[in-house]
A protein has these predicted regions:
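A short beta-sheet element
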Residues: 44, 71-132, 144-153
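Non-catalytic DNA-recognition/assembly elements of restriction-modification systems
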Residues: 1-29, 158, 162-212
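Generic alpha-helical structural context detector
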Residues: 3, 7, 20-23, 41-44, ...
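Short, contiguous acidic/charged loop-to-helix segments that flank catalytic cores in large enzymes
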Residues: 65-68, 100, 113-116, 166-167, ...
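Low-complexity, Lys/Gly-biased intrinsically disordered segments
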Residues: 10-54, 65-71, 88, 144
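Short glycine-enriched, charge-decorated loop/helix-capping segments at active-site entrances
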Residues: 59-61
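Periplasmic-binding protein-like
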Residues: 134-138
């Protein structure tokens, strides 16, 4: 339903480039020494699925000290996350209401995108990148120059898109927002239940606790 609503608004737009709708396009980093065993989650290509879906089994971390020094790549609620290189270039997700983490950053393989006043909706931006035509166009750009696909900032910013009138984007945002927040809430609750299961199951199997 959400994609249908998006397309009704999107295909009524005027020709533009993705950069026209962005206030921020940045990637992050990890220390040269590699990932930490714990600390602040550092989102990479291995984690990105789509909004509401995230692979927590492949989590990597950066230290709290490194996180505090970051001037780019810090994730905020409403940020759109784009996998920018490798076999799955173009996969897109979104951070919202503590999903996938209340505090996290991205590594050098992920772009953070934030909309500007011409497209004042992170939800609109997410569905724009989820659109099959735009995903294919990004992947084609990434695959055109090397054996290992990859996108640079210029290739992302110059992606041809359609840009509807601001009031149409705001109307779409108001309509879709309750559904998006509910998806984030459900995802966070599912993670809590999974964590509880993983904590209790070994204790049940060992007899440390009983269901009686």
């Amino acid at each position: 339903m959400a994609q249908v609503l998006f397309e009704q608004v999107y295909y009524d737009g005027s020709s533009a480039q993705l950069g026209d709708a962005l206030s921020t396009l940045e990637s992050g980093s990890r220390p040269k020494g590699g990932a930490e065993l714990d600390g602040i989650p550092s989102i990479g290509a291995e984690n990105i699925e789509r909004f509401g879906q995230y692979d927590y089994t492949k989590e990597k971390f950066i230290s709290h000290e490194y996180f505090k020094r970051l001037n780019r790549g810090v994730v905020h609620s409403g940020d759109v996350l784009l996998y920018k290189d490798g076999a799955y270039t173009g996969k897109v997700s979104m951070a919202l209401d503590g999903f996938p983490h209340a505090q996290c950053a991205v590594n050098e393989h992920i772009f953070i995108l934030r909309p500007n006043e011409l497209a004042p909706s992170s939800f609109f931006l997410y569905f724009l990148l989820l659109n099959s035509e735009n995903k294919q166009a990004l992947f084609s750009r990434a695959s055109s120059k090397a054996a290992q696909p990859g996108l640079n900032q210029t290739e992302v910013k110059t992606l041809p898109i359609l840009l509807p009138k601001i009031e149409k984007i705001v109307e779409f945002d108001n309509t879709i927002a309750p559904f998006m927040h509910q998806i984030a809430k459900n995802a966070n609750e599912n993670r809590k239940l999974s964590t509880l299961r993983d904590t209790l199951l070994p204790k049940l199997l060992s007899g440390e606790i009983s269901v009686n």
